[in-house]
Amino acid sequence: MKELVRLFVQIALMRKGPQDLPASAALLAGTAAGYCIINCLISAVLPPIPGHWFGQLIVEIVFVFVWYALLLRVLNRPERFLQTTTAVFGYQAVLAPLWISAVWLVRQFSDDDTWRLPISMLGLAIVVWTVAANARVLKAALEWATPACVALVILQYLAGQILLLYLFSGML
């Protein structure tokens, strides 16, 4: 278990990739469950943010499964699904404490002119790091150039946000 956590940290730091993980459905399920549990624990520690965060988390997890299943099938790389998706959930589990804390800080201090810019910059740095880590995972899985992988990650993020907006705000 310790070695697996170290490996996910190395993936988050962009030193390793999905090819370093075993292709295991059980590991994928455990990693996705771990990602969910980490999100729940961090959200329980921080004062509550209004909204349907748990429902959004479940939709996000299902979306990641569907996104990578379809993407890798369309691009004729379905055999890389287990390792790629495990790597994505693994590095996201590592970065989740930073990301959730940054989102919480942005929401808490959105009206405070003193803290708005530094906290927004922190959030932006985490988003950029997340995109870079995910693009590196995709680059290993697809054997594409980095800019194309960055574009795919941004497309995934936008599609996921549109789905969440549609399901939870009723705006679309």
Regions found by a protein language model. Name each.
Residues 77-155, 159, 163:
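Hydrophobic alpha-helical transmembrane segments and adjacent short intramembrane/lumenal linkers
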Residues 36, 53, 65-68, 116, ...:
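Generic ordered-secondary-structure signal
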Residues 43-49, 105-112, 172:
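Helix-coil boundary and interhelical linker segments in multi-pass alpha-helical membrane proteins
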Residues 1-92:
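Selected alpha-helical membrane-embedding segments in polytopic membrane proteins
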Residues 161-172:
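Juxtamembrane boundary at the C-terminal end of a transmembrane helix
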